Amino acid sequence: MQIRGTARKYVYILTPYLIIDNTMQQALCLAAQAGVDVRIVTPKIRDKWYVHPATQFTYEELLRSGVRIFEYTPGFIHSKVFLSDDMVATVGTVNMDYRSFYFHFECGVFMQGTSAIKDVKDDIESILADSEEIVLSKWEKRPWYKKLWETLLHVFAPFM
C-alpha cells in the first residue's frame, strides 16, 4: 500500500491473482484518478479455473477509474512485482489476494536507489509488450453469464 500511496508518476503491478479488498481497490482507483499511471498485469491463461473470473470481477471498476489492465498472453505469468516512479520496487512471493495479505507468511525484496530497478522496469515493459490491454468499452460488452460467474466467484474471494 505504501508504494501506491506515495507514487507520483506511475505504479506497475504484476500479479497472477488480483483478488483485492475494497481498501486496496479504492487505493488503486484513487491513485489513477489523481493522475498516477496505474498498470496491472495479470495472466490471460489461468492456472486455477475459479481464480481468473474472481480476478476479473474487479476489472470494471478499476478501468472506470483509469487503471490500465493488461493480460499476459504468451502463457501463465506468475510474477509478483511492484514498481513505482523508477525509485522503488518489490519482487517476491506476495500475490494480490486475501491469502497472501492475511494468512500466509510471504517474503519479498524491497529495492530503493539501486540500478536493479531499471532492470525490473525493462522486464515489465517487455511483459507489457506481450500483453493485451483490456479496454473498458469492450469489457462492458462481455456476456451477462460471464458477469454473473465473476460475481458468484467473487463471493468466495476471501477464501481464495
For every predicted segment, state its role:
Residues 7-12, 17-160:
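PLD/PLD-like phosphodiesterase catalytic module centered on the HKD motif
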